[in-house]
């Protein structure tokens, strides 16, 4: 039965998401739920006494007020019955009955949407990686879905904004409520709404209360194909996002970080337990989705690609002699000559994969794509091996775009 939108708003606002969906499934209509006799609520399994009382004293006054506010602030109300309700949400264990959205319309089922999450207490490394990965994902045609809280979420949002392409920010409170009440916080909210989309399960005017973040995380995961966790401590809410993704059958990707850093202890543990895929850049995530979105995903712009290895200078003719002024002896600055290290002689210090990657780095290959191609190491092992070499101090990652040997590696004898 097609129900007036205000009945959907009434039911979604009255009860928690899972309970509201259970009531809807019982009556198959929010109007029927609103008009039902009190004794019928006793037939719905799992309802508390308080929830039954709320249903018995039903009123549409608040729903009318919410819809008036939505109309005034140009906030869209997407209900379970609507054609543009994302199919991805319907597959959730407890799909929301209503989603509020402000900004550009977004057809999620057509998007290679990737969620990004991370700790609020992000390290400079975590903030940079969140920003760089979000930027590359967006430039390659993906839709970044993230939060707006300081730390990794905010860095990811800024990275996507820098590209000029759409993004989605999922809020715990209303889409009209800045998380930070400063002028910069208000400008950020307006900027995201202009360039992308703000979404929430909470009606307008709702503050960003701590108890709402679980529902926010469920929506974040539900709208996405996979989740990137940048940094998370042992008790970070980001681990809740990762668990939700696993429960919904979404792949989880993790950016490896310093073993001794408290802000990455949780994400590193996901890698240790083989519960997540290690990644170093956005392109590594999208490798799993090219076949599903062949016309939407594309290579990163040239400015974002990893640098290729330099071409060696042409060899001199076989019979040519070095040109030299008469009476002058050519001086060679021996310090400027690169030192060649045969990593193959160091099997007691490095694994075969490490030797192959270190040799490729020494030959001048710097991008992960080039390193994989020239070392012969499979992508999953290459990523984890490079990460371990970085932690041991033999490989440097000055930007997320390329890798180099460190002085420690070059000084090996």
Regions found by a protein language model. Give the residues of each.
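Short, small/acidic-rich helices and loops at N termini and domain boundaries
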Residues: 1-81, 394, 400-401, 407-413
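Glycine-biased, small-residue-rich flexible motifs in mid-sequence functional cores and linkers
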Residues: 1-3, 79-413
